[in-house]
Amino acid sequence: MKKTALVTGGSGGIGSEICRALAEDGWQVAVCYKNGRAAAEALVSELKERGLCAEVFYCDIGDKDSIDKCVAEVRDSFGFVTLLVNNAGTADIELFTDMTDEKLCEMMNVNLLGAMRMSRAVLPEMIREHSGNVINITSVWGEKGASCEVAYSAAKAGLIGFTKALAREVAISGIRAVSYTHLRAHETLANL
């Protein structure tokens, strides 16, 4: 039985490289997108032409209903989600004092809460199976902070903290939760 990876933000630069690496390593890859449908479809076509297994799925990680629908569709197509890669995110370069409350909420919703919701959607089955991995793609700004990216930095710092706490909570069930900064995200994920 092939292992299934669900990758959010799978149509973008880092996400598409993660999808390629996983597909090349024999994974069934759910390439999830919100805004990059054409790029996601092009990536899946490229992978299928090479005899690799991938499908496109729409997912707005800022919306719980969209997450639940996406996870259900991935399960229907591929079965058990063995690996979740929370890669989707958004960033704006803007002074914190100029940021609207709506933009602040969007940063937290997409960069932190979206990953938490995606994890919550796949974890019950992983816990039942005593198997699975959650990888959260973070940023060096979550560790160091960045001027004009205060909300993004805070959300990514929260994602790092979430990952550490989640790892402790799910380890007893045989599940791993790890984070990688995007500077290292291009490294192979084959050993996870």
Protein language model annotation of sequence segments:
Residues 11-12:
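Conserved glycine-rich cofactor-binding loop
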Residues 27-41:
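Conserved glycine-rich Rossmann-like NAD(P)H-binding loop of the short-chain dehydrogenase/reductase
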Residues 95-96, 103-108:
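Substrate-binding pocket helix/loop in short-chain dehydrogenase/reductase
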Residues 119, 155, 163:
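Active-site helix of classical SDR
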Residues 124, 168-172:
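Alpha-helical segment proximal to the catalytic Tyr-Lys
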Residues 139:
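Residue(s) in the substrate-gating loop at a strand-loop-helix junction
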Residues 181-188:
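Conserved small/polar residues in nucleotide/adenosyl-binding loops
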